[in-house]
Every structure is written in C-alpha cells, then in structure tokens.
C-alpha cells in the first residue's frame, strides 16, 4: 500500500505516553501499540512495522518500512520543542540521529534520508 509508512507514522505511537516516561514504558509502548492495532484489525505485517519503530522489539530481521519509520519518527521528534528542551536545528538533528540515536545500528536508508533532508534544506533557502 502506497500509504503504509504514512499510516504507520500516524499510528505507531498510539500507546506512547505523554511527558517523561520511565525506561520500561519506553521499551514496551511500541509493542503495546502494535498489539492494540492488531486487535483493531490491522495486518500482522503493518503491526510489525509499527512495533519496529524503535529497536526494543528484538526482531533481528526488520521490515524495510520499519527503517523509514524509524528515521521519520526519530528525526521528526528532534525538530519539535519539548518541555525539557527546545527543538534542534535540522543539521544538529541529523548529527544526533546518526551518531546518537542510530549509533551502531544498521538503518538501510540513513544515508539516503540525510541526502534527502539536505536537498530539501537547499530548496528552502
């Protein structure tokens, strides 16, 4: 489905709490959300993609859409103001995405995503 990743972006955090959370909740919200979406009738594959938004699912073989979702979710979150911090600038967010959030992680689309973001920055300037 051509809207699979977009739909996952909208629904993958359905069980994520608001405000500061403890580490255990951070580790389980994606799985809880995927289980909830499954009960609503979403396909197993779609639910797996949503569960893999972060790396806590433990799935060794990730869906390719999960890698896209991970990039969008992490990067987008860094561009938002939070009660505990102001939003990062685009270039700062890209550095943090690569060297903190995805450090030692294999995301097959990271380089293409960075290239896309940089090209869009040039369009905006």
Identify the meaning behind each predicted range:
Residues 22-28:
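Post-HEXXH active-site segment of zinc metalloproteases
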Residues 18-19, 79:
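Generic hydrophobic alpha-helical membrane-span motif
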Residues 15-16, 76:
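Short active-site segment of divalent metal-dependent hydrolases/proteases
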Residues 16-18, 59:
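Short acidic/His/Gly/Ser-rich catalytic and metal-binding motifs that mark active-site loops
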Residues 5, 9, 24, 35-72, ...:
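Histidine/acidic-rich helix-loop-helix segments that form or flank divalent-metal centers
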Residues 30-34:
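Generic helix N-cap/helix-start motif at coil->alpha-helix transitions
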Residues 1-2:
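Short pre-active-site segment immediately N-terminal to the catalytic Zn-binding motif
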